[in-house]
Structure formats: structure tokens, C-alpha cells
A protein has these predicted regions:
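Bacterial lipoprotein signal-peptidase II cleavage site
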Residues: 41-51
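Extracytoplasmic "Venus flytrap"
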Residues: 56-71, 79-98, 296
Length: 384
């Protein structure tokens, strides 16, 4: 998806197993943006034949084949660099603590995490501030909007499993591409809150609802407001802001640590259920017909101080091993369907994903821009 042009068909979707989404984000008109797609079922690019002449080593190449020839040569080049710097990867987000440890142990590469709580925009700002230093970020994990807006800052690279990533979830040359995604959800304490069938059902005396942060600053919180804005599959920021204004007015809006219900990505609410609260005290539901979904994109800095290690990192994240680590943390891998068809998907982990039904929606970029303008103008006055 090399351009920002977008259509408006965000309502229709196919069956849901991982995530199936119909949404126009860039370069497509009424096409599906899929985490779970037919196009994801083709075989990944194979490694070059052993009798094929190896290319000159190029750590900044746009593919394994063109720059390294074999995975072993990429691994050797990355090991010689010996380091990788990541930004905006908190350990509790989609299993990154384990993912970083596994990568470091497997390849003997020291991973330095800078500004782990950075937002996507702050990741880009951090890279600009640290540009030219050995500590500058090599790789990014970004929302789609930030990835598209900053594509010129990224190096093109197509991972080995490129063909398993839906065409609509990657920039054509490889400047950014999906690694995982999820649905917005409601996590709730069933001892105190009846299972909410909709976001509006949260407006109930005795319920304390929380967002994961400030929607003016945090993408997850903004997405939570927009999930509550859906009506018949159509986003309306005013509807979402009004819902939280009613919660605030009724004394039903609070902090996550005091909440009986939290609106957040399903992988975050599922992690809450699995740790601390326990499954008996915390459940996760994705309201039917109010299903908001999103991808998170990977990108390599064009100025990466450790270009081979950066490419090895992306190969690892999109490998079966890396994708299953995301799945273990309740995120939905970009290559999920292809892995399931090849019997390389962790079936036990997949069975633990929150169930979703209905037609998923992903906001196209013009819709995001319009909604953010509304939320920015009205949130402080109406919700505070």
C-alpha cells in the first residue's frame, strides 16, 4: 500500500478466525485489510537454492535473497554487529519481553530498549533526536497512520514470509508491514458487571469503566473511543465521546486499577485475565456489530546503525516462532491463516483468543484524521 488514498468501504467482512477486516486504508478501494486473508495462504518465499551463486553481502538490501543469499549469512552479519536498538516496546505489550529475550538468546545479539513507553509518534521523534548515534533505533512498531505518514524514513525490506502477509497489510516495497493485530474489547469483572452486549451497556449504575489512557495522547485509548462510536458498522466520533461523557457524568468513569470494566485491545484484556485477576474474575468480550480492529506495523529505519540485526529482527518476528510468540500473548499474527494451513500455528494458544463475531471495521486514514479532530476539540470539555 504505497499511497495514502483511501476508499470508504469499511463495513463488510468475511468469517473471523484470526481477524478478517474489510477496510480501505491506502491504495485500495473497497478491498479487505486482512489479518486473516485468502491472500495470506500462499507459500512464503523459499530460501535460495544452495547451488545458486551468493550475492555480495549487503546489510541494507531489500530482501534476504538480494543482500545475503541465505539465512546463515544474515545471522552471521547480524552477529558481527552484535547489537540491536528497539523503541516503544514495553515488555507487557504483545509479549515483547519474551520476544526480545528469545531473539537475544537465540542469536547472541544484545538488544537495547529505549523509551519503551513511547507512542508511535514518539518513536519517530526519538529516532530524529538520536539520529547519527549508535543508540538510534534500528526498528519500529507503529500504528498504520504513523507508518504511512513516515514511510520515507524507512528502509524497504521484504521478509522471507512476505507472501503470507496480506497485500493490503504491507507497503509494496516493504517499508512497513503488519506483524500482528487485534480487536477492541471490553474486559470486565463478571462478579460485578453483567456481560456487556454493547458499549452502551456499560452505562449502568455501579459500573466503573476505564480507558487504557488519554485518547488525546494514546492510540489504544483513542481506538477505544472509536469502538464505542460504531453504529451499524459506521464510525461516529461524536457518538463515542458522548458515551464516555455520560459515563463521566454518572460517576462511572475511573482508573484501570479501580475499574470493573476496561475498554482496551483484546490482547491486553486477555493478558489481564491470564495474570493477576485470573480468568474467574476477569472476562473478555468483543461486542457484536461494534468490532473495531487494527494492525500494528513493523518498519526498519533507513539510518539503522545495525542494519543486518534490524533485518534479522524482522525475519524473526515474521517467522513461525515469532508469530507464535505474539499469539501466546493473545495478539493475532499477520501470517495466522497460512500458518494454520501448514500446521505450524500454536493451536492451544489460538484456542485461548477471545471470540469475535460480526463485521470488523478498521478506520481508514481520512476517518482517523476526522475523528481525531473531533476528539481533540470536544474531549476535554465533555469528558475532561
Amino acid at each position: 500500500m504505497p499511497q495514502r488514498a483511501a476508499g470508504n468501504d469499511h463495513r463488510r467482512a468475511g468469517s473471523i478466525r484470526g481477524v478478517t477486516i474489510r477496510a480501505c486504508v491506502v491504495t485500495i478501494s473497497s478491498a479487505a485489510l486482512l489479518l486473516f486473508a485468502v491472500s495470506a495462504c500462499s507459500k512464503p518465499s523459499s530460501s535460495p537454492s544452495s547451488d545458486k551463486p551468493l550475492p555480495p553481502l549487503n546489510p541494507r538490501a531489500d530482501s534476504l535473497e538480494s543482500g545475503f543469499g541465505t539465512m546463515d549469512r544474515l545471522v552471521d552479519a547480524a552477529k558481527k554487529e552484535g547489537a540491536l536498538t528497539v523503541v516503544g516496546l514495553p515488555g507487557g505489550w504483545v509479549g515483547y519481553k519474551e520476544i526480545i529475550a528469545r531473539f537475544s538468546d537465540k542469536y547472541g545479539i544484545k538488544v537495547t530498549s529505549v523509551v519503551p513507553e513511547a507512542s508511535s509518534k514518539q518513536e519517530i521523534d526519538t529516532a530524529a533526536r538520536m539520529k547519527g548515534t549508535a543508540q538510534a533505533p534500528d526498528v519500529f512498531d507503529l500504528t498504520l497512520e504513523v507508518a504511512v505518514a513516515n514511510a520515507k524514513l524507512f528502509a524497504p525490506y521484504r521478509v522471507t514470509g512476505w507472501s503470507d502477509i496480506p497485500d493490503e497489510a504491507k507497503e509494496q516495497r516493504g517499508r512497513w508491514f503488519a506483524a500482528y493485530g487485534g480487536y477492541m474489547s471490553i474486559g470486565y469483572d463478571p462478579r460485578k458487571v453483567p456481560a456487556p452486549a454493547s458499549y452502551s451497556a456499560l452505562v449502568r449504575p455501579g459500573t466503573i469503566v476505564a480507558l487504557p489512557g488519554d485518547p488525546l495522547r494514546m492510540a489504544s485509548a483513542f481506538s477505544a473511543v472509536m469502538a464505542a462510536s460504531l453504529g451499524s458498522g459506521l464510525p461516529d466520533a461524536a457518538r463515542g465521546v458522548d458515551l464516555f461523557a455520560r459515563l463521566k457524568k454518572g460517576g462511572m468513569l475511573g482508573r484501570p486499577d479501580q475499574a470493573t470494566a476496561v475498554v482496551d485491545w483484546d490482547f491486553m484484556n486477555a493478558a489481564r485475565a491470564a495474570s493477576g485477576r485470573g480468568a474467574a474474575a476477569w472476562r473478555v468480550t468483543i461486542p457484536k456489530n461494534e468490532v473495531l480492529a487494527a494492525y500494528y506495523m513493523q518498519a526498519i529505519s533507513a539510518d539503522a546503525p545495525h542494519p543486518a540485526a534490524a533485518r534479522l529482527w524482522e525475519e524473526f518476528l515474521l517467522s513461525d516462532e515469532g508469530q507464535n510468540l505474539f499469539l501466546k500473548a493473545y495478539a493475532r499474527p499477520a501470517r495466522m491463516e497460512a500458518m494454520e494451513m501448514r500446521d505450524t500455528l500454536d493451536g492451544d494458544a489460538a484456542a485461548k483468543l477471545p471470540e469475535a463475531s460480526g463485521d470488523p471495521v478498521i478506520l481508514n486514514i481520512p476517518e482517523q484524521d476526522q475523528a481525531k479532530s473531533y476528539v481533540t476539540a470536544h474531549w476535554a470539555r465533555m469528558v475532561g
